[in-house]
A protein has these predicted regions:
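Catalytic-site neighborhood detector that most strongly recognizes the C-terminal catalytic loop/helix
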Residues: 3, 8, 62-67, 151-174
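Basic, Lys/Arg- and aromatic-enriched nucleic-acid-binding interface segment
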Residues: 1-40, 44, 64-67, 88, ...
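Structural motif
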Residues: 52-54
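Short, basic (Lys/Arg/His-rich) helix/loop patches that form interaction surfaces
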Residues: 15, 19-26, 36, 72, ...
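Well-ordered beta-strand positions in beta-sheet-rich domains
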Residues: 57, 69-73, 160
Length: 174
């Protein structure tokens, strides 16, 4: 009850992000977040040495929780973004600033996230991408234990009760 209410991206909003992706390379980060379910800090702190492009996974080695230390699969849809960021420059981090430096959350949020949301007429926070991923996985029928593994959850039912926001159509079809 005290948790901040989070709203996942709708199918239409996800399509909007896909349409806008070619206008700025930093928009790809939104899609990387949606399709991996990682926290924004986990993606910004991801080092290239922990990314395996050929096998399509990466290791989260620094996380908010112990369960958060995990291997995350890279969806085929977003593999090209990982490849571009990986070979972009000499920065040890996968995602970097235009100057090739490590991205701080505030810098990304203020310089890119907020302007993108305004430009696309969408109102979301980075953590909503995590909720979106979990909802997409649940709607696709992925086993809850597998979802927990992917997103780094341990507790009973946390993923279902806190994160799953089924689209009304999916609920009507159930």
């Amino acid at each position: 009850p005290n948790a901040i209410s989070r709203t996942p991206f709708s199918t239409e909003e996800i399509q909007t992000v896909w349409k806008w992706k070619s206008t700025n390379e930093y928009i790809s980060i939104i899609l990387m977040l949606i399709y991996t379910g990682v926290r924004i800090s986990e993606l910004l702190d991801l080092k290239k040495e922990n990314v395996n492009l050929s096998e399509r996974w990466f290791d989260v080695i620094a996380s908010k929780t112990q369960a958060g230390i995990r291997k995350v699969p890279i969806n085929q849809k977003i593999l090209p973004f990982f490849q571009v960021w990986y070979s972009k420059n000499d920065c040890e981090y996968l995602i970097s600033t235009p100057e090739g430096k490590h991205f701080e959350y505030r810098n990304y949020y203020d310089s890119y996230w907020k302007p993108f949301m305004n430009q696309m007429h969408v109102e979301h926070r980075p953590h909503d991408c995590r909720h979106t991923c979990i909802s997409l996985l649940a709607t696709a029928g992925v086993d809850e234990r597998m979802i927990k593994k992917i997103v780094g959850h341990k507790g009973q039912g946390v993923t279902q009760t806190v994160y799953t926001h089924f689209e009304i159509d999916a609920l009507l079809d159930a």
